Amino acid sequence: SIKELAEAGGEIAEYTHKHPLGFLPASLLTVLLYKVVPMSVKQVQEEIDDIVADTLNILNRIYKGKYESDKRYLKELTEMAMLLAHSNISDADAIRQLGEGWTAEETWAIALFCAIRHIDSVENAIIASVNHDGDSDSTGSVCGNIMGAIYGYEHIKERNIFCPEGKKLEETLELSEIILALADDLSTGCIISEYDPIDTPEKRQWYERYCKMRPAGIHSISLPKNNQ
């Protein structure tokens, strides 16, 4: 359920970010990605403000009676990001108003601002999200998550976004096959258990990847002989 997803997103972030303003933005991001993935690009472009507003409402319901001041501040910052995205203020000036991205709530707000303002262009959204003096790798990463969820891998791959001239995405992105395999496995869900036999090729591959830490089925990676 969406409640379980949102709670899981927050709980995972809480392992390293104990303050509510550290893990609540992760919960928001989880809900937002969940909502936009099944939607068409056109629908997201037309309804992004409503989607974000609904995401805030869902967060409030899930953490009802908890972290009230933190939720209120996060809501205000999120709404400010949305307002700035539709304003005439330059990207740089708007980002400065939202912070520098050194805290989770600022990272969320900056990434969201860039995604909404440049909802029609993955390239422009990412460029805006990393062109500031703050924690630009974090804001770029979160913005990339949002834009990737909206547009999908195939769109990015076909356009060879940010690739050197004459190079394809899979040739430019480091460890691209491992990243794609991990994404596919995450979307599939775990297919092995300590109580069940490893009796199919698919289960064997999972066992090799996540119990033995070997890149089984990923042909571009070869391990040193003493690690095989």
Where do the language-model regions lie?
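A short mid-domain helix/strand-loop element embedded in enzyme catalytic domains
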Residues: S1-I2
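Extended accessory regions or peripheral subdomains of proteins
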Residues: L5-K64
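Catalytic phosphate/nucleotide-handling subdomain of diverse soluble enzymes
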Residues: G9-A13, H17, F23-K35, E106-T200
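A cyclin-like helical interaction fold
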Residues: P38-H118, L180-N227
